[in-house]
Amino acid sequence: MEVLKRENPLIHMITNYVTVNDLAQVTINYGGLPLMATHHDELKEITKMANGLLVNIGTLEPYQMESSMISMKIAKEKGIPSVLDPVGVQASKLRRDFAKKIILEGEPSLIKGNLAEIKTLIGETSNSIGIDSFEDSLSENTKNKIKEYARERNLVVVVSGVVDFITNGEESASVKNGTYKMSKITGTGCMLGALLTLALSFYDHKDLRFKEVVKAVSTWGICGELAEERLREKEGLMTFKHNLLDELSIINDETIKEREKVIYE
Protein backbone atom coordinates (compact mmCIF):
# COMPACT_ATOMS: atom_id res chain seq x y z
CA MET A 1 0.00 0.00 0.00
CA GLU A 2 2.70 2.50 0.98
CA VAL A 3 4.71 1.62 -2.14
CA LEU A 4 1.71 2.29 -4.35
CA LYS A 5 1.29 5.70 -2.76
CA ARG A 6 4.97 6.57 -3.30
CA GLU A 7 4.91 5.48 -6.93
CA ASN A 8 1.68 7.31 -7.85
CA PRO A 9 0.88 5.19 -10.94
CA LEU A 10 -0.95 6.97 -13.76
CA ILE A 11 -4.23 5.19 -14.48
CA HIS A 12 -6.06 5.83 -17.73
CA MET A 13 -9.78 5.20 -17.35
CA ILE A 14 -12.48 4.91 -19.97
CA THR A 15 -15.49 4.50 -17.77
CA ASN A 16 -19.18 5.20 -17.36
CA TYR A 17 -20.59 8.64 -16.58
CA VAL A 18 -22.48 7.36 -13.52
CA THR A 19 -19.40 6.78 -11.35
CA VAL A 20 -16.61 8.69 -13.07
CA ASN A 21 -15.96 11.11 -10.18
CA ASP A 22 -15.93 8.31 -7.62
CA LEU A 23 -13.40 6.34 -9.65
CA ALA A 24 -11.12 9.35 -9.85
CA GLN A 25 -11.38 9.93 -6.10
CA VAL A 26 -10.79 6.29 -5.20
CA THR A 27 -7.70 6.24 -7.41
CA ILE A 28 -6.29 9.28 -5.62
CA ASN A 29 -7.17 7.85 -2.20
CA TYR A 30 -5.34 4.60 -2.99
CA GLY A 31 -2.24 6.39 -4.21
CA GLY A 32 -2.71 6.74 -7.95
CA LEU A 33 -3.19 9.47 -10.53
CA PRO A 34 -6.42 9.24 -12.56
CA LEU A 35 -6.72 10.42 -16.15
CA MET A 36 -9.85 10.06 -18.29
CA ALA A 37 -9.46 10.41 -22.05
CA THR A 38 -11.66 9.23 -24.92
CA HIS A 39 -10.86 11.62 -27.80
CA HIS A 40 -9.17 9.70 -30.58
CA ASP A 41 -6.66 12.48 -31.26
CA GLU A 42 -5.05 12.04 -27.83
CA LEU A 43 -6.00 8.48 -26.96
CA LYS A 44 -2.88 6.72 -28.24
CA GLU A 45 -0.53 9.21 -26.60
CA ILE A 46 -2.23 9.01 -23.22
CA THR A 47 -2.63 5.24 -23.18
CA LYS A 48 1.07 4.76 -23.96
CA MET A 49 2.13 6.94 -21.02
CA ALA A 50 -0.20 5.23 -18.53
CA ASN A 51 0.86 2.62 -15.98
CA GLY A 52 -2.53 0.95 -16.12
CA LEU A 53 -5.78 1.00 -18.12
CA LEU A 54 -9.35 0.53 -16.89
CA VAL A 55 -12.21 0.01 -19.34
CA ASN A 56 -15.72 0.03 -17.83
CA ILE A 57 -18.70 -0.61 -20.14
CA GLY A 58 -21.41 0.68 -17.80
CA THR A 59 -22.73 3.31 -20.23
CA LEU A 60 -21.86 2.22 -23.74
CA GLU A 61 -22.00 4.50 -26.76
CA PRO A 62 -20.32 4.10 -30.16
CA TYR A 63 -17.48 6.61 -29.77
CA GLN A 64 -16.57 5.28 -26.33
CA MET A 65 -16.65 1.70 -27.60
CA GLU A 66 -14.15 2.58 -30.32
CA SER A 67 -11.97 4.45 -27.81
CA SER A 68 -12.02 1.46 -25.47
CA MET A 69 -10.95 -0.92 -28.21
CA ILE A 70 -8.13 1.36 -29.37
CA SER A 71 -6.77 1.79 -25.84
CA MET A 72 -7.04 -1.88 -24.95
CA LYS A 73 -5.11 -2.88 -28.07
CA ILE A 74 -2.39 -0.31 -27.31
CA ALA A 75 -2.13 -1.61 -23.74
CA LYS A 76 -1.76 -5.14 -25.10
CA GLU A 77 0.93 -4.03 -27.56
CA LYS A 78 2.90 -2.06 -24.94
CA GLY A 79 2.51 -4.53 -22.08
CA ILE A 80 0.46 -2.10 -19.98
CA PRO A 81 -1.76 -3.94 -17.47
CA SER A 82 -5.44 -3.55 -18.29
CA VAL A 83 -8.71 -4.23 -16.49
CA LEU A 84 -12.10 -4.82 -18.08
CA ASP A 85 -15.20 -4.21 -15.98
CA PRO A 86 -18.06 -5.70 -18.06
CA VAL A 87 -20.82 -3.88 -16.20
CA GLY A 88 -24.26 -5.30 -17.01
CA VAL A 89 -22.90 -7.63 -19.69
CA GLN A 90 -25.88 -9.89 -19.01
CA ALA A 91 -28.37 -7.09 -19.76
CA SER A 92 -28.10 -6.78 -23.56
CA LYS A 93 -26.72 -8.36 -26.70
CA LEU A 94 -24.74 -5.18 -27.42
CA ARG A 95 -22.86 -5.48 -24.13
CA ARG A 96 -22.26 -9.19 -24.55
CA ASP A 97 -20.96 -8.84 -28.10
CA PHE A 98 -18.70 -5.92 -27.24
CA ALA A 99 -17.29 -7.61 -24.13
CA LYS A 100 -16.47 -10.74 -26.10
CA LYS A 101 -14.82 -8.68 -28.85
CA ILE A 102 -12.65 -6.59 -26.54
CA ILE A 103 -11.61 -9.67 -24.56
CA LEU A 104 -10.64 -11.48 -27.76
CA GLU A 105 -8.83 -8.58 -29.44
CA GLY A 106 -7.61 -6.56 -26.45
CA GLU A 107 -6.65 -9.43 -24.12
CA PRO A 108 -7.17 -7.66 -20.76
CA SER A 109 -4.96 -8.61 -17.83
CA LEU A 110 -7.93 -8.84 -15.49
CA ILE A 111 -11.71 -9.06 -15.71
CA LYS A 112 -13.77 -7.95 -12.72
CA GLY A 113 -17.49 -8.49 -12.37
CA ASN A 114 -20.27 -9.66 -10.11
CA LEU A 115 -21.34 -13.28 -10.34
CA ALA A 116 -24.07 -12.64 -12.92
CA GLU A 117 -21.62 -10.80 -15.17
CA ILE A 118 -18.92 -13.46 -14.92
CA LYS A 119 -21.40 -16.31 -15.42
CA THR A 120 -22.56 -14.61 -18.60
CA LEU A 121 -18.98 -14.43 -19.90
CA ILE A 122 -18.35 -18.12 -19.26
CA GLY A 123 -21.64 -19.12 -20.90
CA GLU A 124 -23.80 -19.84 -17.86
CA THR A 125 -27.31 -18.52 -17.19
CA SER A 126 -27.42 -15.74 -14.60
CA ASN A 127 -30.10 -14.47 -12.23
CA SER A 128 -30.35 -10.72 -12.73
CA ILE A 129 -32.58 -7.78 -13.60
CA GLY A 130 -30.94 -5.18 -15.82
CA ILE A 131 -27.38 -4.73 -14.57
CA ASP A 132 -28.20 -5.85 -11.01
CA SER A 133 -27.17 -9.34 -9.95
CA PHE A 134 -29.26 -11.50 -7.65
CA GLU A 135 -26.72 -14.29 -7.53
CA ASP A 136 -25.51 -15.06 -4.02
CA SER A 137 -23.57 -18.31 -4.17
CA LEU A 138 -20.74 -19.67 -6.28
CA SER A 139 -20.92 -23.41 -6.94
CA GLU A 140 -17.82 -25.57 -7.28
CA ASN A 141 -18.78 -26.30 -10.88
CA THR A 142 -18.94 -22.59 -11.71
CA LYS A 143 -15.67 -21.99 -9.85
CA ASN A 144 -13.96 -24.61 -11.98
CA LYS A 145 -15.34 -23.05 -15.16
CA ILE A 146 -14.07 -19.63 -14.09
CA LYS A 147 -10.63 -21.10 -13.37
CA GLU A 148 -10.57 -22.70 -16.81
CA TYR A 149 -11.68 -19.43 -18.43
CA ALA A 150 -8.87 -17.53 -16.66
CA ARG A 151 -6.25 -20.16 -17.47
CA GLU A 152 -7.15 -20.36 -21.17
CA ARG A 153 -6.95 -16.57 -21.56
CA ASN A 154 -3.96 -16.00 -19.27
CA LEU A 155 -5.78 -13.43 -17.14
CA VAL A 156 -7.09 -12.87 -13.63
CA VAL A 157 -10.81 -13.05 -12.91
CA VAL A 158 -12.25 -11.28 -9.87
CA VAL A 159 -15.81 -12.22 -8.91
CA SER A 160 -17.25 -9.75 -6.41
CA GLY A 161 -19.96 -10.83 -3.98
CA VAL A 162 -20.67 -11.72 -0.37
CA VAL A 163 -17.51 -13.81 -0.65
CA ASP A 164 -15.18 -12.51 -3.36
CA PHE A 165 -13.40 -15.06 -5.55
CA ILE A 166 -10.13 -14.38 -7.37
CA THR A 167 -8.32 -16.74 -9.73
CA ASN A 168 -5.71 -16.76 -12.47
CA GLY A 169 -6.48 -20.36 -13.33
CA GLU A 170 -3.54 -21.68 -11.30
CA GLU A 171 -3.96 -19.87 -7.98
CA SER A 172 -7.27 -18.97 -6.36
CA ALA A 173 -8.36 -17.07 -3.27
CA SER A 174 -11.59 -16.27 -1.45
CA VAL A 175 -12.02 -13.01 0.45
CA LYS A 176 -14.66 -12.67 3.17
CA ASN A 177 -14.21 -9.00 4.01
CA GLY A 178 -16.95 -6.47 3.35
CA THR A 179 -20.44 -5.49 4.41
CA TYR A 180 -23.92 -5.65 2.90
CA LYS A 181 -24.10 -1.85 2.85
CA MET A 182 -21.48 -1.76 0.09
CA SER A 183 -24.02 -3.35 -2.25
CA LYS A 184 -26.42 -0.47 -1.59
CA ILE A 185 -23.99 2.21 -2.82
CA THR A 186 -23.94 2.87 -6.56
CA GLY A 187 -20.53 2.16 -8.02
CA THR A 188 -18.69 0.24 -5.29
CA GLY A 189 -17.95 -2.46 -7.86
CA CYS A 190 -16.73 0.13 -10.35
CA MET A 191 -14.53 1.66 -7.66
CA LEU A 192 -13.04 -1.77 -6.98
CA GLY A 193 -12.13 -1.89 -10.67
CA ALA A 194 -10.02 1.24 -10.18
CA LEU A 195 -8.26 -0.31 -7.18
CA LEU A 196 -7.53 -3.47 -9.14
CA THR A 197 -6.01 -1.46 -11.98
CA LEU A 198 -3.77 0.25 -9.47
CA ALA A 199 -2.83 -3.10 -7.95
CA LEU A 200 -1.72 -4.42 -11.34
CA SER A 201 0.15 -1.25 -12.26
CA PHE A 202 2.88 -1.66 -9.66
CA TYR A 203 4.18 -5.15 -10.42
CA ASP A 204 5.41 -6.85 -13.58
CA HIS A 205 5.77 -10.28 -11.97
CA LYS A 206 2.62 -12.41 -12.33
CA ASP A 207 2.74 -13.89 -8.81
CA LEU A 208 3.23 -10.51 -7.14
CA ARG A 209 0.41 -9.04 -9.18
CA PHE A 210 -1.96 -11.79 -8.08
CA LYS A 211 -1.21 -11.22 -4.40
CA GLU A 212 -1.63 -7.46 -4.82
CA VAL A 213 -5.00 -8.02 -6.49
CA VAL A 214 -6.14 -10.17 -3.58
CA LYS A 215 -4.92 -7.50 -1.18
CA ALA A 216 -6.86 -4.79 -3.04
CA VAL A 217 -10.08 -6.82 -2.84
CA SER A 218 -9.58 -7.44 0.87
CA THR A 219 -8.64 -3.81 1.52
CA TRP A 220 -11.82 -2.54 -0.12
CA GLY A 221 -13.91 -4.91 1.99
CA ILE A 222 -12.11 -3.86 5.17
CA CYS A 223 -12.77 -0.21 4.34
CA GLY A 224 -16.45 -1.10 4.11
CA GLU A 225 -16.37 -2.76 7.52
CA LEU A 226 -14.61 0.21 9.10
CA ALA A 227 -17.00 2.64 7.41
CA GLU A 228 -19.98 0.80 8.86
CA GLU A 229 -18.44 0.72 12.33
CA ARG A 230 -18.14 4.53 12.24
CA LEU A 231 -21.85 5.07 11.63
CA ARG A 232 -23.83 6.73 14.39
CA GLU A 233 -27.54 6.61 15.04
CA LYS A 234 -29.60 8.08 12.16
CA GLU A 235 -26.61 8.12 9.79
CA GLY A 236 -27.43 6.36 6.54
CA LEU A 237 -25.99 5.29 3.22
CA MET A 238 -24.55 8.63 2.14
CA THR A 239 -22.60 8.94 5.39
CA PHE A 240 -21.49 5.35 4.87
CA LYS A 241 -20.21 6.22 1.38
CA HIS A 242 -18.31 9.21 2.75
CA ASN A 243 -16.80 6.99 5.46
CA LEU A 244 -15.87 4.35 2.88
CA LEU A 245 -13.82 6.74 0.76
CA ASP A 246 -12.37 8.30 3.89
CA GLU A 247 -11.20 4.93 5.23
CA LEU A 248 -9.51 4.12 1.93
CA SER A 249 -7.43 7.28 2.22
CA ILE A 250 -6.11 6.42 5.70
CA ILE A 251 -5.95 2.61 5.87
CA ASN A 252 -2.50 1.09 6.43
CA ASP A 253 -0.85 -2.31 6.09
CA GLU A 254 -1.11 -3.03 9.81
CA THR A 255 -4.89 -2.67 9.76
CA ILE A 256 -5.14 -4.77 6.60
CA LYS A 257 -3.08 -7.59 8.12
CA GLU A 258 -5.14 -7.54 11.31
CA ARG A 259 -8.51 -7.67 9.55
CA GLU A 260 -8.01 -9.48 6.25
CA LYS A 261 -10.05 -12.66 5.78
CA VAL A 262 -8.34 -14.37 2.87
CA ILE A 263 -8.25 -18.08 2.11
CA TYR A 264 -5.88 -19.25 -0.63
CA GLU A 265 -6.82 -22.43 -2.46
UniProtKB/Swiss-Prot annotation:
Coiled coil: none annotated. It catalyses: 5-(2-hydroxyethyl)-4-methylthiazole + ATP = 4-methyl-5-(2-phosphooxyethyl)-thiazole + ADP + H(+). Its cofactor is Mg(2+). It is an enzyme of class 2 (transferase). Belongs to the Thz kinase family. Catalyzes the phosphorylation of the hydroxyl group of 4-methyl-5-beta-hydroxyethylthiazole (THZ). This is Hydroxyethylthiazole kinase.
